[in-house]
Every structure is written in C-alpha cells, then in structure tokens.
Regions:
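Internal alpha-helical transmembrane segments
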Residues: 31, 78, 82, 96-154, ...
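Interdomain regulatory linker/hinge segments that flank or connect interaction modules
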Residues: 93-133, 175-225
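PDZ/PDZ-like domain micro-motif
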Residues: 156-170, 187-189, 247-261, 279-280
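Small-residue-rich helix-interface/hinge motifs
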Residues: 13-98, 412-434
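Alpha-helical transmembrane signal-anchor/signal-peptide segments
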Residues: 43-48, 144-162, 167, 472-476
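Pore domain of cation channels
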Residues: 119-130, 401-414
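Alpha-helical transmembrane segments of integral membrane proteins
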Residues: 16, 20-24, 29, 400, ...
Length: 477
C-alpha cells in the first residue's frame, strides 16, 4: 500500500512539473515575443510569423495582417519572423530584400532606421520586465505587504553573526549606511555579498552598536532550490511555535500532536520560537523528547521520538536528519501588515523586479571574482522542477514564479552576447555611432561565437541539474 501511495504521489508531482513548466514558459515566451511583435507593428515592420515553440507545427491561424500564429511541439522558446528574415534567428535575407518591390521594402525590418530596429529588439526583454512588475504589483495590491521586524531573534552558534558579536534581540537599523525596516532587506543584502564585509548598526537596549560581519557560503537544503550554497550570517527572525500541520503517520501525529498546538517547552526548556524547536530536534540524535503544548488553554504533556529520514526519502532534503513531522505556520512573531494602494503596489512590483535584476547581476559578477560558484546556474530541468514545486504549493505561487522567470529571461536576453537581443543591441549601438552597419562577416562570426557560448551555458546548466534528474529517476524505483 505504501508503494502505491508513493507511486501516486510521484506521478502527481510529475504531472505538476509538466503542467507548471508549460504554463510558466509558454506565458513568458508569449510575453517576450509579443513585445517584439507590438513594437515591430508600431514601426511598420511586416511580421510573417509569430511562433510559440520550435519544430513541427501543432496548429496555426493567419490574422488579417497576414501574420501566421503557430504553436509547435518543442515548448522551449519562440520567435517572431519578419518579412526579410532568412530564418527564425532573424538573419537578414539580403537576396530577398533586393527582389522586393517598394511596398514590401517599406515593411522590411533591416531597412528601418537603426533606432526603430533597436526599439523592436529591446521590446522583448522590456515586455518581460513590465509583465513581472504588473504581476508582482497585483499581488501586493491583493495581499498587502507584510513587514517583518529586522530583529536577530535567533543567532546560530558559530555563525558569522555570532563571531561578530550579535546578541539575541538586536534590532538592525542599517547596513552600509542604508536604512533597514524589513528583515527581507537583510536577507537580500547578505545574499548578494558573499565574502564582503558588511557594516551593521544595531539597536541593543537603546544603544547604537556597530558590528562588522562577513557572510559565508553555507550549504542548505530547501524544498524549492534543493541542495545549494547560499551566503548567510546566521540570524533569523522568531517564528511562532505553532503547529500548522502534521506529516501523516509521522512521530508527532502518533504522539498526539494536533494542528494549532503551541509548543511552550521541550525537555524543560521554554520555547518561544519555531527555530528553537527545529534546533532541539536536529540535535536530538533520535532520542525521546518531552514536549509541552498549549491547546485550548490547557497545557498538555507529550512524548515524541524523532525519526531519522533515509537518503532520498524527502524530495526537499535528501540529507538524513531527525524529524518529528510538524509543519510551521511560518508566521513571524514580530511583524506588521500594511495595505497597499494600486499605485504604490506597482512601485513595489518595480522594486521587486529590480531586486531580482541586481541580485542576478551580482551573482554573475561574484562568479567571475570567485566569490560564488556556478553551481546555481540551471537549465530547463531546474525550471521545470521549481515550477512543479511551486504549483504543488498553490497556483498563486506558480504565477509569482512565472513573473520571476520572466525577469530572468528578459535579463538574460539583454546580455551582450551575439544571437541574443543584447548582442543585436550592441551592433545597433555601433551602427548608430559609426553611421554604418557592422560588416556581415563580423556579425556572422559573432553569431557563431554567441551560439557556442549559449550551448556551453546550456551544457553547464544541464550538468548542474543532473542531481535533480537523478532524484526524479530515483522516485521511479
């Protein structure tokens, strides 16, 4: 029976991976190509094909302007093809241009002014950014903004924060002179600063204390990203020690825990933070724990023996560790909720989009300065895996993940690599300055180099994703 249940769960996740991946990528590709398409139309460029996917055509229709809208079997991208393109990669067809009549030449992309060609190319990535801003903004408007007090409620022993002199209860006021009013800002700063000294100013019992901390790369396992290394300083905000749910058949469920229970002590030690619970369980070595919970105003003593997980048992964390099978609400102890109007929501959406852009660029820069490894560069397997996991949490999370991917695709396309939009923009910038196009031989050679770079990045992403692929196949067994 357990084997059947596991097979059903794995099959359900596989379907979520496929559905989530197709949902996210199709929308992101459509938005990107629609950006190119709309600006091309505005500039009077004749668009012959708008394709979602590559390869053999599944279905298509032709609109009143003569554009063929097609869907293809390989959903790993898309393209907009202009009248004077030789192929889907927008390589100019010079022979076709020479044979065009005057009407056709008016719609030829390569014959448009350089600023119009640049606008058409830039419109794809910009559409991705705008889409993300609107999606993030819509969620801020819908749910409001939760601000978590930037308090160091829990300090991991031996961490950079502990070494720097952080004390439990320290309230972070600024980092590097930048005011901090939300714990999320601490995380964002730390994640983009591996190996760099950060100057903290904290409030401790009404006194201003200056502390210097250097984030270090720590190996982590989480449900979405799996096993990876992330810069950290070892501080967390307090999370209510309330049981949100229980793992079916887990030690806590067997011991009599119920959703809504508030853990108030473990082995005689007062508990005010879910992080404390996790730490005690993690250090238990599977030994019995005496836990007191508050339920309906009554203190109830419970005894639970943590279960050691087996390698590969948990998709979110393949490392064996003691667990009791309780889920946290994730609700901070110190937080405030702020309602957000539509204009402010768009601003917050733009801020979140900008944070993703700067964080990505910081990560790429840190790879070249040897502060980060390239292990987080992933490909379609990682995107599909994350899409499935977000879909399993809820549709709203999948939509926000789609917005995140939209930012990433937009930014990657702006990298100055020939064959990408950014490479075309570099050629147009040179043309605008010199007054003449870059020689075709140089462009063709650059495109080959660009294609080689893209293929190498894809191979690196595939290599980094082998762990995820192996995990998928292990579930089949």
């Amino acid at each position: 029976m357990e084997i059947i249940t596991q097979f059903t769960d794995n099959l359900s996740f596989a379907l979520l991976v496929i559905a989530g991946f197709l949902f996210a990528l199709t929308i992101v590709v459509f938005v990107h190509e629609m950006g190119h398409f709309l600006v091309a139309r505005w500039c009077g460029v004749t668009v012959t094909t708008f394709s979602i996917g590559f390869g053999k055509e599944i279905g298509a229709f032709v609109d009143k302007h003569g554009t063929r809208w097609r869907f293809a079997w390989i959903p790993l991208g898309g393209y907009v093809k202009f009248l004077d393109d030789e192929n889907a990669a927008s390589v100019p067809d010079r022979a076709a241009i020479e044979q065009m009549d005057d009407v056709q030449r008016q719609g030829a992309f390569q014959l448009k002014p350089v600023w119009q060609r640049a606008a058409v190319v830039a419109a794809g990535p910009l559409a991705n950014f705008l889409f993300a801003i609107l999606i993030f903004g819509a969620f801020f408007w819908w749910t409001g903004q939760n601000l978590v007090a930037p308090r160091a409620d829990y300090i991991q022993p031996g961490s950079p924060a502990a070494e720097a002199g952080f004390k439990a209860g320290d309230l972070v006021q600024s980092i590097g002179g930048r005011a901090i009013d939300d714990f999320k800002q601490i995380d964002q700063t730390v994640w983009t600063s591996p190996g760099r000294t950060l100057d903290f100013v904290v409030d401790r019992d009404g006194k201003q204390i200056s502390l210097q901390v250097v984030p270090e790369l720590i190996e982590r396992n989480d449900y979405i990203a799996g096993k990876h290394r992330r810069p950290t300083i070892g501080i967390r905000y307090a999370v209510e020690p309330i049981v949100a749910g229980l793992t079916t058949g887990g030690p806590a469920a067997v011991a009599g825990f119920e959703p809504g229970d508030r853990v108030i002590s473990m082995n005689g030690k007062p508990i005010n933070d879910f992080n404390q619970l996790q730490e005690i369980v993690g250090q238990s070595d599977g030994q019995k724990l005496d836990i007191t919970v508050l339920r309906d105003g009554r203190e109830i003593p419970l005894t639970v023996t943590p279960k050691m997980t087996t390698p590969g048992e948990r998709a979110s964390d393949p490392t064996p560790r003691p667990l009791i099978g309780v889920l946290s609400t994730g609700r901070p102890v110190h937080w405030t909720h702020v309602n957000v109007g539509p204009i402010e929501a768009v601003g917050l959406g733009a801020e979140q989009t900008w944070t993703i852009i700067t964080g990505t660029l910081s990560y790429v820069g840190d790879i070249f300065t040897n502060r980060q490894s390239a292990e987080q560069i992933g490909g379609v397997i990682r995107i599909a895996d994350a899409a499935g996991k977000f879909a399993s949490i809820g549709f709203a999370y999948l939509v926000q993940f789609t917005a995140f991917i939209s930012v990433s695709i937009g930014l990657i396309n702006l990298f100055p690599i020939p064959i990408l939009d950014g490479g075309h923009l570099v050629f147009y910038a040179i043309e605008a300055v010199t007054g003449r196009p870059v020689k075709e031989e140089i462009q063709e050679f650059s495109f080959r180099v660009g294609l080689a770079l893209i293929l190498m990045l894809m191979m690196l992403g595939f290599y980094n994703d082998l762990g995820i692929l192996a995990q998928w196949f292990s579930w089949l067994g």
